[in-house]
Amino acid sequence: VKRPMNAFMVWSQNERRKIMDQWPDMHNAEISKRLGRRWQLLQDSERYPLSRRRSVRLKHMADYPNYKYRP
């Protein structure tokens, strides 16, 4: 079972699609660098709405009630 996505991962999914639509030939490594820089510039309130973060976590907890992270 995978860990629930953190705020950056959820945010970057949507942003990655936008970048790929504009620049379909851009390498994934370059996209990741751009996303990282943009993420660092965002205010905490812009990064990811608290309600969405909670819903992702709550869904994961409901789907996997006995889940325990083990590295």
UniProtKB/Swiss-Prot annotation:
Keyword Hydrolase: no
GO CC annotation terms, alphabetical: nucleus
Any one of the GO BP annotations: negative regulation of transcription by RNA polymerase II
Signal peptide (residue range): none
GO molecular function: DNA-binding transcription activator activity, RNA polymerase II-specific; RNA polymerase II cis-regulatory region sequence-specific DNA binding
Protein's cellular compartments: Nucleus
Protein's name in the database: SRY-related protein LG27
